[in-house]
Amino acid sequence: VHWTAEEKQLITGLWGKVNVADCGAEALARLLIVYPWTQRFFASFGNLSSPTAIIGNPMVRAHGKKVLTSFGEAVKNLDNIKNTFAQLSELHCDKLHVDPENFRLLGDILIIVLAAHFTKDFSPDCQAAWQKLVRAVAHALARKYH
């Protein structure tokens, strides 16, 4: 993926404002609520019976933070996203058998969460840069499937 200087600035500038714990928890909770079939990968998380239960679930919150922390590695390694996610791709493909479409869905949800949290900063140019990033991450995570 080729990044312009402006795209890199838009991504890193916004990322510096992100509360990884809060945005990660919200993104994963939204994924589980909006796309309930994704819950099957999180059966060990306990009560996922309602939106309130999901939002209040400490395991969802902790894993959301873990997911977004990992996403931060993409921000730090924009020029090497494929290698950054090689091990996670293998884990999600070989051991967890996650449908790679779910990576795209989570990326789209992350865009919504960022837009909701950073309305003033989330210009169309910023959205385009982030959309490019979430697609690159989803592609890197799905790489082991091909």
From Swiss-Prot:
CDD domains: Hb-beta-like (cd08925)
Domain Globin: 2-146
Signal peptide: none
Reported function: Involved in oxygen transport from the lung to the various peripheral tissues.
Family in the record: Belongs to the globin family.
Self-association and partners: Heterotetramer of two alpha chains and two beta chains.
Protein name per its UniProtKB record: Hemoglobin subunit beta
Organism in which the protein naturally occurs: Aquila chrysaetos (Golden eagle)
